[in-house]
């Protein structure tokens, strides 16, 4: 089963990310999927803001992974933001050691997460974007992927 939240603008997607950040815990991995321009980076920017990241967050398409320090108040040390679009194999994704990055109290968000799902799927939140029109997006979360935070995610999707 899935849960869904619709956003109607970039600012609403950012706000949804800020709110979602309050549900995250150290060690979480989030796999984001959706077509180009669907809102993966926008949601990540909102999550980063919610975690107290002070620097600008952009898609790490050419660097593959970027680290951003989070505020102490968030309880999360680092946001590891990955984009595996330009990888060519599961071996290349595995070499990024994304699962190890979160072991020190961080959170990892992986754009084009469907490519990493065979390696991380069981241990990761799965969030998919559907483009409805130029501005409107459906953010769809696989409810089996959020574990004990299902009630919080249900509340998040009801907004």
Predicted features and spans:
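Conserved nucleotide-sensing/catalytic segment adjacent to the nucleotide-binding pocket
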Residues: 56, 69-112
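Phosphate-binding P-loop
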Residues: 21-27
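Short beta-strand-centered segment that lines the nucleotide-binding/catalytic pocket of NTP-utilizing
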Residues: 53-68
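N-terminal pre-Walker A segment at the start of P-loop NTPase domains
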Residues: 1-19
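Short phosphate-coordinating micro-motif centered on Lys-Gly-acidic
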Residues: 3-4, 91, 99-159
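Conserved lysine of the Walker
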Residues: 40
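P-loop (Walker A) phosphate-binding loop of NTP-binding proteins
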Residues: 35
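Hydrophobic anchor at the beta1->P-loop junction of P-loop NTPases
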Residues: 30-32
